Amino acid sequence: MSKNTESLISQLLDAAGAAGADGADAGMSRSEGTSVTVRLGKVESSERSEDIGAALRVFVGKRNASVSTSQLDSDSIAELAERAVAMARVAPEDPYVRLATAKEVAGTLPEIDLYDDAVPAVEHLTETATAVEAAALSNDGITNSEGGSASHGEAHMMIATSNGFSANYKRSSQGFSAVVIAEKDGAMERDYDYSVAVYGADLDAPEDVGNSAAKRTLSRLGPQKPPTGQFPVIYDQRVSGSIVGTLASAINGAAIARGTSFLKDSMGEQVTSAGLTFIDDPLRPRGMASRLFDGEGLPVARRAMVEDGVLKSWFLDIASATKLGLTPNGQAARGMGSAPSPGSSNFYLENGDLSLEALIAEIDEGFLVTEMMGSSVDMITGDYSRGAGGFWISGGKVSHPVSEATIAGNLKDMFKAITRANDIDMRKSTAAPSLRIDGMTVAGS
């Protein structure tokens, strides 16, 4: 983090004090990125972006307010602080929100490998975007392309508080993708594939990703609506992270404190199939959501949220922990446009032993989901319904593509009916292997 950025965040805190705040904390992000898009072998766009943003939270007695800005000249900083304090003075009292104390904040920060200093040139990004699209277009049956793209970005993150805490880190990311189209009997289908990682060396080969995008697209031709009834459903690892994400929402401390989660009374109880362990790991080297401290400056640690199917912990920030009578556990997330709130980092379900093919082979009639559309999830009751596409399974084998399907169930039952495969992609921030869930309602024809 540059001296200029450190100076800016100090100015924010000083301005808050001058405006009458009893305390304040601030977060700042400075990011830059480059992206290239190629379509049918020609460069369509090449863009460079630079952004800076800051969020300020002020405390006046038991009242608080949060504001954000991208205007960081001296006058704008002073005006922002004055506005925040004015907002706090008329806000309702909240006895649960406070600054982290000196004893709570992170001391010596962990060393995590989050930054790749090998920055790709624009020419390299162009070559990658061209290669991934060309590989996809080389497949027979692919008739058009929506483009190949490649990008690189890095961000510098900093948090500081008026009681002396200040820390920062930087992270990088790279990725590329291809989206292509196939046509059969006048009907078109499209699909994509991508690769993204913190380090360029961890990316898949562009040719492999392009060929995968083509294969996925071609396999979707001639879809049918599925039958309606109760069937086992397999979530391909491409979409299985959505199930992990719903669990994260259900054990979010803010929802528990409000009483708006169907798992609010389930601490210490079995909430998933036995043998399943869900980990939140902010310290994963090269993790897409790794962090050295949480959004309020607290130290972070790898934590089993669900162990052997039993719920062990909530995602907590200071406010939700205080309201629940618990100790904050360093799981506050912070965006530049919002106050800290509980949130996951690298959250995943540990791998199983079975292959995806083995999961499929055990099913007489069922649905392999590879695409999700829309969402209707009631976190109070656990009722779940989503649009889906993928493939019908018949006699233990993939039979034909499926579209215009709806899958439904209740998350309480779904979590306890999970059988996992062994194909997790740990580069994702929310990840799981392919998952089989029995007894789902499938609606189609």
Where are these regions (language model features)?
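Dual-mode signal for accessory low-complexity, basic/Gly-rich regions
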Residues: 266-445
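Active-site bordering "gate/hinge" segments
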Residues: 1-291, 295-298, 307-310, 395-397, ...
